[in-house]
Amino acid sequence: MTVSAPFPSKASADTAVPQGLTPAQAAEGWLLLFDGQTAFSWDCPGKNAVREGVWHLEEGSTAWPFSRFGNHWELVAEVAGPVRLYLPHEHVLEHNGDSFDRLQVVCNGKKIRYEGKGFSRLSSVERPAGPPAATIGITAPGPQPARLRHLRLRPQQLQPLWNGRNLDGWTVNRADPKRQQARFRITDQGELLVEGGPGDLVSTVHAADFILQFDCRTLGKHLNSGVFFRCIPGQYQNGYEVQIHNGYKNNDRTQPLDFGTGGIYRRAPARRVVSNDEEWFTVSLIADGRRLVTWVNGFPVVAWEDPRPPHDNPRQGYRAAAGPFSIQAHDPTTRLLFRRIQYAPLPPRPNSHPTPQLP
């Protein structure tokens, strides 16, 4: 399953994101939950529409994000009209004012803190049917539509996956003797330089469901790399791959070359190439069971559910098992920098994501 929505109009190559975060917000790890044009990356079976940058949910509509975000995060949104927001640990907030009010929610484990004019906490409110472990849920109790804009979230308490000083916690993949041409070294600026290829650098950390964020910069045009995850230990690049490739066709960023940065290689192309070569960009990935969601500079580019039967080999089917991460050195032209590679495991989840039903 791929949750996708076309953009209202074709965007030119000189516009990276039609509506997005500031560069500072993207660098801080913020993720757009609403792109201002579509309901991409949401399960929303009820009647809804986006008009002039505002998401309208008609009476009775329910919306859930495509993935979870763990137990530590910060949420910011602007809300108008009658809206109910369902948060972890039975917290339910209600808004009834007609004008937009800003809401900030901080989740720190089992502690929920919120600030916002026009919001009240409800008690004894039954949670509508939907994914039982969803981070947030939104309903429109009516009679007027619920309206939302500028909805974003920042995962918190991510752990370093790379220490920024040396290659402790990582090993060069020796599984294929014919693919040993890559070079991995730390620059004076504390960045990981990946050169040449083919080759592969593998983490000692294994993960199944997680949040991953990293910064990358290509040192050339249309270079190819990627980060593999849920890899089969001891094999060469046998896992899912979040692609790094900033090329696109026909002067149109909605036509990525080779799946595009943020795409899940050979599975789900990026719906838009957000990043530029020779500039730093941030890639965020959430692997939540069958559901894989990616953002580039905080802009959502993939929301894909692996429909294949379970299989230990991710090339043959859906792989749920934990495995290492690996950084790809694709070919002799490869020359990229990485920094701030960090992740957080997601808590245990239910075995499935039920289809949300209207309350």
Label each residue range with its predicted role:
Residues 7-359:
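Carbohydrate-interacting regions of secretory-pathway proteins
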